[in-house]
């Protein structure tokens, strides 16, 4: 439910009605009919001129038959009491262990219908006939001023699949954009970070309506999938928990048809649409994550990837050109990470963790598409095994037991360590085996690669790896082999 402000905060009869009809549920017996009408007061400006050259954090995807565009969307969104790091002015103001464990999803209205203007970054096929009908929606991560972490990791797969992608700018990043180009972004505004939720609702409904003001007008939009990683994984899980039932199309249908929150430890409640969660070995047991696991059910899958760390390796470069302006100042209240400082905690001989998490992420999206389009249930998987104190149980090589097991840990030539302290646990490392150890385990490079290929083939048959991923995984293993 949504709760009104305490007395003395200016709650008028109009605001009470707004709280019941447009921002929450059942206050004073008013039925839950939340954000269900047309976004009549949403205004769209764009596409902005020359987005590839002028838009910070915008990729050039022309060589892949796609186009990049920016839009400014204005509307009205409630200011609410924050419920997670994703809508707080500072992540340090939140108790994430408590936030992630919440099972009672109340909202507390502070001020209704405050104006906002946000930026949408849109990637879409130039040829409408190649559009899949699917739109991936991701909150842009405040770190670095607004990065699409799933776009960065999986854009090759999205474009090969014909998907459109929309990144919604987080309110915390508006000052950096205005400072970068005041003429272009001077109208960006927000009263409070909690307006993010209204921005996501308006953007989703705008795209799904498909009317002339939509950034995807003329595209036959069928499904919207919300995803995110790390901070924006929290945003995805938070939206699913608090807003999925409250955010509706004019006819009462869902705005979002699926959720894929990744690299966050947050509980996600049962919904009427499919949900897939992913946690790396860095994330599965942090912030109370072990208590926020939920058994698979007909609309839910939970994956934990042994050996993978939170700060994941980038995929190989493709024809997409990274942004000309690749970073803006990170807002205050966000963590400041130093890879160099964390590497000093790694043991002798360790190098950065290079686990190809993007390959498993591709399989998640492929399985979600089959689930939505053909009703094909995704595979189940085991949890990472734990000791009595909640740490990952390790095998004889020092790698985690259980979970989704890629050849990095099932046919290992390195130890994948996720045991640094503090924030450095997000980075992870690997300690390559000596040549002597590799030869003792596998005999020869050829025997090792044959075992990797068999392991990758099993993963593909289990649908935990895409078919094209088999050869890619074998090539990665070949580069790592020390024989």
For the regions a protein language model found, what residue spans apply to each?
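N-terminal secretory signal peptides
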Residues: 1-11, 19-24
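Generic low-complexity segments that are intrinsically disordered, proline-rich and/or Lys/Arg-biased
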Residues: 5-6, 32, 39
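C-terminal segment of classical bacterial N-terminal signal peptides
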Residues: 27-33
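C-terminal His-loop and adjacent cap/lid subdomain of alpha/beta-hydrolase
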Residues: 35-483
């Amino acid at each position: 439910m949504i709760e009104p402000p305490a007395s003395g905060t200016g709650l008028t009869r109009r605001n009470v009605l707004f709280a019941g009809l447009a921002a929450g549920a059942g206050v004073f017996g008013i039925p839950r009919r939340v954000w269900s009408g047309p976004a009549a007061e949403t205004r769209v400006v764009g596409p902005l001129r020359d987005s590839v050259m002028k838009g910070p954090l915008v990729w050039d995807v022309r060589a892949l038959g796609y186009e990049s565009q920016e839009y400014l969307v204005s509307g009205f969104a409630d200011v609410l009491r924050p419920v997670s790091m994703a809508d707080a002015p500072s992540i340090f103001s939140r108790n994430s262990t408590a936030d992630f464990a919440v099972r009672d999803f109340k909202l507390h209205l502070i001020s209704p219908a405050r104006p906002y203007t946000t930026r949408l970054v849109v990637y879409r096929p130039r040829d409408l006939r190649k559009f899949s009908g699917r739109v991936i929606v991701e909150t842009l991560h405040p770190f670095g001023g607004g990065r699409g972490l799933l776009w960065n990791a999986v854009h090759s797969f999205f474009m090969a699949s014909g998907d459109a992608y929309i990144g919604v700018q987080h309110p915390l990043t508006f000052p950096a954009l205005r400072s970068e180009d005041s003429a272009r972004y001077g109208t960006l505004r927000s009263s409070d970070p909690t307006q993010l939720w209204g921005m996501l609702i308006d953007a989703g409904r705008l795209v799904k309506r498909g009317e002339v003001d939509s950034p995807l007008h003329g595209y036959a939009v069928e499904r919207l999938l919300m995803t995110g990683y790390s901070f924006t994984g929290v945003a995805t899980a938070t939206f699913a928990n608090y807003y999925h039932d409250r955010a509706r199309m004019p006819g009462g249908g869902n705005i979002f048809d699926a959720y894929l929150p990744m690299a966050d430890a947050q509980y996600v409640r049962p919904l009427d649409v499919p949900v897939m969660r992913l946690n790396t070995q860095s994330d599965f047991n942090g912030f109370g994550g072990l208590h926020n696991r939920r058994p698979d059910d007909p609309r839910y899958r939970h994956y934990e990837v042994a050996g993978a760390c939170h700060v994941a390796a980038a995929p190989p470069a493709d024809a997409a050109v990274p942004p000309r302006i690749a970073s803006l100042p990170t807002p205050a209240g966000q963590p400041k990470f130093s890879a160099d400082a964390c590497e000093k905690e790694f043991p002798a001989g360790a190098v950065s963790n290079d686990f190809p998490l993007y390959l498993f992420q591709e399989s998640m999206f492929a399985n979600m598409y089959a689930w939505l389009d053909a009703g094909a249930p995704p595979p189940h998987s085991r949890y990472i095994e734990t000791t009595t104190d909640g740490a990952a149980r390790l095998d004889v090589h020092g790698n985690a037991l259980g979970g989704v097991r890629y050849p990095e840990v099932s046919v290992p030539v390195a130890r994948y360590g996720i045991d640094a302290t503090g924030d450095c646990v997000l980075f992870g490392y690997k300690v390559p085996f000596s040549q002597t150890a590799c030869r003792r385990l596998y005999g020869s490079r050829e025997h090792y690669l044959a075992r990797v290929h068999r392991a990758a083939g099993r993963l593909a048959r289990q649908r935990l790896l895409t078919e094209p991923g088999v050869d890619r995984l074998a090539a990665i293993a070949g580069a790592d082999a020390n024989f």
